[in-house]
Regions:
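Active-site nucleotide/adenylate-binding loops and adjacent lid/helix of ATP-dependent enzymes
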Residues: 2-10, 14-15, 21-22, 90, ...
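N-terminal phosphate-binding or glycine-rich loops at protein starts, especially the Walker A/P-loop
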Residues: 2-45, 53
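A short, GP-enriched loop/loop-strand-helix hinge that lies immediately N-terminal to
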Residues: 12, 93-137, 152-158
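Hydrophobic residues within alpha-helices
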Residues: 23-27, 114, 142
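Anion (oxyanion) recognition and catalysis
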Residues: 32, 119, 147
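N-terminal glycine-rich "phosphate-gripper" loop used for MgATP/nucleotide binding
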Residues: 43, 49-119
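Acidic pyrophosphate-coordinating catalytic loop
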Residues: 48-49, 164
Length: 185
């Protein structure tokens, strides 16, 4: 049986980095090694891509995975047909990836950026496409799309950071009015 090459992306430059590491540990421990060649690629908080050189996934949540002596720098090329690039000394090894499983949370993971890279590279991936990811990440845009589609949802009010900084009292009044009107519907 021919195994499918699967790249599991985890970590990321996001406040959700630690959550992603815990999620990736679970996903990687439950993948069938008889069916898949697994390429676990972690993205550090600084944005470095590292092919994790071990199958001891318990080291992911603790951060110990970063110290594995078999780790190698890696990247997914946006050029179609290049796949996963693994850097070993002066050499670059190409591994064709059949599918990517992004186990990334938050900004730069669920917002369409990784999905856009994978679309450029022509690599299929698990999860929503670029536009759906971007819309879902922006809560205001999600609410506007849901409103436009007639989806029932709780009343909401957009408050921008600058409004809170410059006009806090007016924001409080608007919020109080919104709550009162919601209670009387």
């Amino acid at each position: 049986m021919v195994k499918l090459n699967v790249c599991v992306l985890f970590g990321g430059m996001s406040p959700e980095h630690a959550v992603s590491l815990r999620s990736a540990e679970s996903v990687l421990n439950h993948m069938d090694k008889e069916k898949y060649n697994i390429f676990p690629v972690g993205i550090t908080k600084d944005g470095d891509w590292i092919l994790y050189g071990s199958t001891d996934y318990s080291k992911l949540p603790t951060g110990e995975w970063l110290n594995c002596p078999n780790n190698r720098r890696a990247a997914i090329s946006p050029i179609r047909g290049q796949g996963l690039l693994i850097f070993e000394g002066d050499c670059v090894i190409r591994e064709m990836i059949e599918i990517v499983f992004p186990v990334l949370h938050g900004e730069n993971g669920e917002d369409g950026t990784i999905q856009g890279l994978l679309e450029l590279a022509g690599i299929p991936y698990v999860g929503p496409h670029v536009a759906a990811s971007a819309i879902a990440m922006d809560k205001t845009l999600t609410k506007l799309v849901a409103d436009n589609a007639g989806v029932a949802q709780a009343d909401w009010l957009l408050v921008r950071d600058t409004e809170v900084s410059n006009h806090l009292q007016q924001v409080i009044i608007r919020l109080e009015e919104k709550v009162k009107s919601s209670l009387h519907q």
